[in-house]
Amino acid sequence: MAYQNLKTLYYKKYNIEEELNKRLENPCTLKTELVISPVIKGEKLPSEKYNLFYLPINNILFLEEQIFSNSKKVTDIFSQLPYIAQNKCIEEVMINEIIKTNKIEGVISTKKDISESLNTKKTRFSGIVNKYKEITEGNLEKINSVEEIRKIYDDIFKEDILKNPENELDGKLFRKNPVYIQDGIKKIHSGSLSEEAIISQLNDLIKFMNIKNVNSLIKACITHYYFEYIHPFYDGNGRFGRFLFSIYLARKIDILTGLSLSYAIFLNKEKYLKLFLETSESKNCGELTFFIEGMLEIIIQGQESIIGMLEKKHLKLEYALNYIKELELSVEESDILFILTQNYIFSNSPLKDSELCKYINLSPYKLKGYIKKLSEESYVETISRRPLIHSIGDKLKNVLE
């Protein structure tokens, strides 16, 4: 018989208490100290408590292997890209990830919004952009206290959620009043009922996050579930939880896998929500096996999108490089054209001439002369005069399309 969740077995008239004991007594089962009260019709049942556990079924082991195999593909292709293409690729993937994590919660943000925040302009999204930028720079948060969770939250949302008085945290560190999650008019989840409970459960979570004998991918999935179960804030819990998940993946797998999480979740919003709801159901008794399996499948979908994008753009860049080599251009002109081509292929944001000067170590005056020659041959076109911005021209664009 295929491995099924306890709720399904209950409706098939199995003795789920007996089946639960079999699963808990299995020597391969990971039993955590993380405790939940199951949720029925959006309300927690304080009278029932279960320790979260999971069983590493064969499909989970297969999915883990696939994630590490995909990560090797990602890093192999990425390492073949020139420096500028790498930078622009990470920046573009990060921007898309922020847009998607916002959109999952119904928060609309555009590439222009995120790009402006990235370029030091203070906006409502500056906090979340700066935090994701830290992931790309390898400055990965390690959390050791509930105070650090609150600080990260403030850093992300002080110019956004916390501007609204309704979202102000009225406890010592977190919310002190109940919060409910609704799907339309139906209540589907309630966070922990008091700040005391929130702090106690977050301390348990931090302890779990920092233990060494749990596989990092499994730990990331369990942490994500339990953080969202607690729901310590009035708003922003989903985005905060996915940010923590991205940190885990960036640290333990690779940066681009970490930055494709929300993209994949956005494509699987119904599945994502269902994973949470089913795990919290009373008849599933705190089993995380299917939540972990589902989240690993979502991670793989994000990786596959990254691999497809990298393969396509890497081939296009190789073709462009060979084309540029065949042109009768000076070394400087070829370098300028290749840099602009990298930016065109890997980024939707224009490259300012001032930035271009830094990449090729030329003065603005000398750059202007080379740009003039390239423009005369239709290899380069002017995008903006203030600030001065150029991109590849139609002649090269037609070659790449």
State where each predicted segment sits.
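Phosphate/pyrophosphate-binding active-site loops
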Residues: 2-50, 185-309
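Glycine-rich, N-terminal phosphate-binding loop and its surrounding beta-alpha-beta segment
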Residues: 54-104
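Generic alpha-helical structural element
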Residues: 63, 83, 87, 121, ...
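Charged, amphipathic alpha-helical oligomerization/scaffolding segments
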Residues: 66-69, 73, 127, 204, ...
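Short amphipathic alpha-helical segments and their helix-coil junctions
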Residues: 70-82, 131-136, 203-209, 271-280, ...
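Active-site core of Fic-domain adenylyltransferases
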Residues: 80, 87, 91-234, 242, ...
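C-terminal regulatory or interaction extensions
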Residues: 224-232, 242-401
